[in-house]
Structures are given as structure tokens and as C-alpha cells.
Amino acid sequence: LASDFILLVAKKEEKMLPANVVKRELDERIESLEQKENRKLKKTEKQTLKDDVVMNLLPRAFTKNQQTAVWIDTENNLVHVDAASSKRAEDALALLRKSLGSLPVVPLAFANEPSTILTDWIVQEKIPHWLVALEEAELRGSQEDSVIRCKKQPLENEEILALLQDGKKVVSKLALEWEDTLTFVFNEDCTLKRLKFADAVREKNADILKEDYAQRFDADFVLMTGILSKLIENLLDEFGGEKVRLG
């Protein structure tokens, strides 16, 4: 816990059993039992055997551990999940909800349509002064499969501008740099991907000895959440605040 911020880590442990290993063991048991009893096993009997095979193999299975950080901003009533996919984020929130008994949260949505704002930034060259557009974007058409991905390409390119000005495409993803502090990809669903802090930020707490892991961890958490909170505040202001939900 730091100030108004709470950090939690959800840990998921999975036992990895290759399907072919289970099938081979199951086939051997079915064949052995059918020969012994001189009859074909019923579907329910095969399922019972399969359950038994899985239970016997589990102690020898590989274990896959997955950790998902959840940062709660109690002042602004926001829950941030560090996850590469929405499924992983939902799993972490489901665990938190189960632990608390209740967790009435919904994905953050801005009042103004993000793709419209992102497109205006590029077409009208009116990106906020605290942001720099990098040479990476995704342009989306009206059809789901109509996507153009731009990388290492100036977005003021005439062909790109023509597509945006004609309304054939909108900017659905845009790589940005915020105040020489952080780079990230902003998505039209309001998620931030590929966050990377500048070296100057990463080295700010370098004076804390590596051996003092807890102190360094706490200092980094306070520093980075402070930066992200300010960024999110800027984005909320630029996109018209949080969308009002009816009902």
C-alpha cells in the first residue's frame, strides 16, 4: 500500500498435461480392461477411466505459474490490470471479486470516441503538447478485416492522410511518447499496450542498493504509479472524461 494506491498480485498455477500423453495412457487402460472383461466399455466408463488417468498423471505434470499485477487507485476509483490479454485481466478481476465478495467494475470508456480523436490528431496536426506521435499506427476501415498497420513510417505520409481525410480509415491504435517519460501504444478500446519507461525514470531509484529489494520495489512502485496516474489524468481530460453509463 502506497498513499492511495494498493498493489496486488494474482497468481495462477496450471498443471500442464499434454493431451497425447493422456490419450496414450487412456487407450492402454481401455484396451487392457476390454480384453480382460471381453466387452466394449461404455462411454461413461471411459470417462471415469480418463478422470482416473488425469488424477494419476497430475503429480508428474509440469507446472506453469502466471502472475498478474493489479493496481488499485482508491482516490480515483480505478483498477489497473497489467495483463497482455483481456481474458487474463478478467481472470485476475474474477479472483479479486471472489476474494472480496463483490467488485462492481466496468472497463474504462471515454466520453469522446477515441478513434475519432486519434484520427483528428493526425489529420489536423493538433496532438496535445504533452504527447508525441511515434511512427507506428493501425488504421481501421468499416470492415473488421480492413486494417492497415504502419510501422517506422511517418504518419504525415500523403497516402495515409488521404485515407484518413476521405473517411475510409480511422486511427484505431497509435504509438505515443508522453513527456519524454514513457512510450506506449494507445488502443481505441482505451487500453495501453507496450508501456516502456524512459531510462532516466528507470534509473531514478538506482541509489537504492539492490540488496534492499523491498525498499527499491516500493520506491519504483510509487514512482511509476505516480507517472501513470498523471498520464491517465491527461488522457481523461483530452478524451472528455469518463463516459457516463446509463442505468
Predicted region positions:
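Intrinsically disordered, low-complexity, charge-rich terminal extensions
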Residues: L1-G247
